[in-house]
Swiss-Prot record:
Highest taxon listed in the record's lineage: Bacteria
UniProt xrefs under InterPro entries: RutC, RutC-like_sf, YjgF/YER057c/UK114
Gene3D superfamilies: RutC-like
GN (gene name): rutC
Catalytic activity: (Z)-3-aminoacrylate + H2O + H(+) = 3-oxopropanoate + NH4(+)
Protein name: 3-aminoacrylate deaminase RutC
Keyword line: Hydrolase
């Protein structure tokens, strides 16, 4: 199955051997996304809502670069470092998915950088 690598303009180099997203058979797979700037520094330190917005804007950029939109998202994997941030994360999340919500799960865990509060990986079906 052929795949297309999706790298939006202005994307920094990943910390590990992966790409921001891939497109295969009309499905966009967005890698785990954190609130990083182009130099892989965490932005909005201590602010879960702002980090969530940054993460979702980055995911939106990957999906739009592939030719889709946020309405095409069918599944999200959410990783957060502290359940105390759950309400703030959900408030921002709901802004990006105002209609039919995608399936998802949410796990509390440690992340690759100590100041990162949230990571989201996404699957979107475009061209439906």
């Amino acid at each position: 199955m052929p795949k297309t690598i999706i790298t939006p303009p202005g994307t920094g180099k990943p910390l590990a051997p992966f790409v921001p997203g891939t497109l295969a058979d009309g499905v966009v797979y967005v890698s785990g996304t954190l609130a990083f700037d182009k130099n892989n520094n965490v932005v909005h330190v201590g602010d879960a809502a702002a980090q969530t917005r940054h993460v979702l804007e980055t995911i939106k950029s990957v999906i739009e670069t592939a030719g889709g939109c946020m309405d095409d998202v069918t599944f999200n994997s959410i990783f957060l470092t502290d359940w105390q941030n759950y309400a703030a994360i959900n408030q921002v999340y709901a802004e990006y998915f105002p209609g039919d919500k995608p399936a998802r799960y949410c796990i509390q865990c440690g992340l690759v950088k100590p100041d990162a509060l949230i990571e989201i990986a996404t699957v979107a079906h475009i061209g439906r």
